């Protein structure tokens, strides 16, 4: 069930996705594998979270193991645009970049912006 929160001029769309436990497990294993294959280990300090976009893994949407996730996200985007009365049939929608992050207890992700994107999405595969 989706919800929209309006914080003028920002609208936030929240929804639950229906991924199976096996799908989630497979994606978590894939992210852990990416972490082990990191290409830029000097970038990560003890207080910073691992971010796939800095390690050569910035195109999750092209990874077959994440296919169903991105199909569902795309459907949510269409619902969000419909709720704003935006005719998405007149738009070309595409995923530009997508990556996983791993944040351990004392780690954080620095403040940042996604200025190149019209929409930004966060999905929590596993939250502890």
Residue ranges and their predicted role:
Residues 1-87, 108:
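Non-heme Fe(II)/2-oxoglutarate
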Residues 86, 94-128:
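Catalytic core of non-heme Fe(II) oxygenases with the double-stranded beta-helix
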């Amino acid at each position: 069930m989706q919800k929209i929160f309006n914080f003028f001029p920002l609208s936030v769309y929240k929804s639950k996705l229906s991924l199976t436990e096996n799908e989630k497990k497979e994606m978590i294993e894939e992210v852990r594998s990416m972490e082990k294959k990191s290409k830029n280990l000097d970038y990560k300090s003890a207080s910073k979270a691992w971010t796939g976009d800095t390690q050569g893994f910035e195109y999750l949407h092209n990874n077959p193991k994440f296919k169903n996730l991105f199909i569902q996200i795309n459907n949510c985007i269409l619902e969000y645009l419909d709720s704003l009365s935006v005719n998405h049939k007149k738009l070309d929608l595409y995923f530009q970049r997508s990556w996983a992050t791993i944040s351990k207890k004392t780690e954080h992700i620095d403040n940042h912006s996604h200025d190149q994107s019209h929409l930004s999405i966060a999905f929590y595969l596993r939250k502890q």
